[in-house]
Amino acid sequence: MISHTPKELASRLRSQFPHTPTQGQERLVHVFSKFSISEKPRCTLIIKGYAGTGKTTSIGAIVRTLREIRVSTVLLAPTGRAAKVMASYSGINASTIHRKIYVGAKRSDGSDVYKIAPNLFKKTTFIVDEASMIGESSGLVTNLLDDLLEYVFSGVDCRLVLVGDDAQLPPVGCSSSPALQESRLASMHSLTIATVELTEVVRQELDSSILANAHALRLDIENADSEGKTNFPKIDLSIGPDVVRLPGLELQDTLETLHGRYGEEGVI
């Protein structure tokens, strides 16, 4: 698929990071450089990591590297919002999974039916962000994860990168995120899989009160005793200005103001 050696690819990818890669990102550089030239069937790379560990930076670096060596790249996400975010940090267009992999048709009774579209891409790397949101139902009486895999690997020499945070809430009806379970994917779909988990918080991200507090809470959970007991989470408002204590009586007015300023999709 790629004429470059793993060493050359690693050097190119490393140079695309805006900072010195963390240990986890350095491992990703190593794994991705081998993943990209592997001749094994149905090559899949899972990149896991919670907020602040540099997933976005890493995917941006990967996309720029693939473009530099002229490898076709398709960016996908489960929702329109996630696709917009992905496009903004990668610099190229992104689509929802549904829009890319399904094609509509009409039944004889006039009702709509959807089927998997033909994958006409060749030697293309598909990168799917927010993969933890991908469940086993698409709302179209079909299995979204299965359909995604069938679509991608029906193309000629195509590869798949799944990016997500398995600490996020899993899809409705699932106890965990099926798209991030390496053993399950390998056994049920005959994939050749490598997994890289980013665990170190990028130093710049700790300047964010939101991420710093989330990181502290995660450490509390991980350090809970054998009975699962842990201290009630405490929010540190002194880290930075992006966390504000909001009295309950002010919540509705604040939400209305923010919705008016940024729109409903811009406020969580």
Features from the language model and the residues they span:
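Walker B catalytic acidic pair
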Residues: 129-131
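Hydrophobic positions on the alpha1 helix immediately C-terminal to the Walker A/P-loop
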Residues: 58, 62
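Pre-Walker A (Motif I) flank of P-loop NTPase domains
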Residues: 39-45
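The conserved Walker
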Residues: 51
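Inter-Walker segment of RecA-like/P-loop motor cores
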Residues: 74-126
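N-terminal pre-P-loop "Q-motif" helix
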Residues: 18-37
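Conserved lysine of the Walker
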Residues: 55
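Conserved helicase motor core of P-loop NTPases
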Residues: 4-9, 32, 40, 153, ...
